[in-house]
């Protein structure tokens, strides 16, 4: 059996285009067990992501958090958040990945009022549980969106209608107020990780040390180790 593998660049940004320039939306009816090492490895993307656990259970690692997702639960991953999914057995995890600009153009009032507060917030993810009323409403909308994608003829307009309903529920039920300190800490950690990953990529044929890797991001050796361990749970050397 051939296993799927996610492709990323040296900063761990996913390189695949989700959807098209005209319709930046993609639906993936995936079984994570069929990926290399039974996981969708560390990656990030500017797009928003919603995943639902229809069968099995999933361990999601988002930023510095570990989240157990049993059957019937889902998760929203915010734009730019480094994350990974892993499983211990076969699963069915339909998910959608789409650009924030699909909901509204960047220079519009809708984008400024309802999209920017979310993608610029300190909230990296939102777990969706069936026993919480508004979270369950989102899960129900997700299943409708999945059904539309599996129909013989794709219904982009119907998909958009459901996405806007979903986004309205998410926006109205969460505190998206920006915390500049939290944003700075999150972005600084991820920027440092990506800088060091870039350095490793550029010098992988050479004999490099932890001190050299840390210096590339202007941090201490202990700081470099902490960023690697807390974000991708491994050592850089």
Located regions from the model:
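Generic protein-terminus/edge-of-domain signal
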Residues: 1-70, 87, 112, 126
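Short hydrophobic/aromatic patch on the recognition helix
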Residues: 72, 223-228
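Ligand-binding loop in jelly-roll beta-barrel domains
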Residues: 80-103, 108-110
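Double-stranded beta-helix
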Residues: 101-126
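Short, Lys/Arg-enriched, Trp-marked, Pro/Gly-tolerant hinge/linker segments that flank
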Residues: 124-135, 148-206, 210-217, 230-237
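Short, Lys/Arg-enriched alpha-helical recognition elements, typified by the DNA-recognition helix
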Residues: 142-145
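Helix-turn-helix DNA-binding motif, specifically the short coil turn and the N-cap/start of the second
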Residues: 220
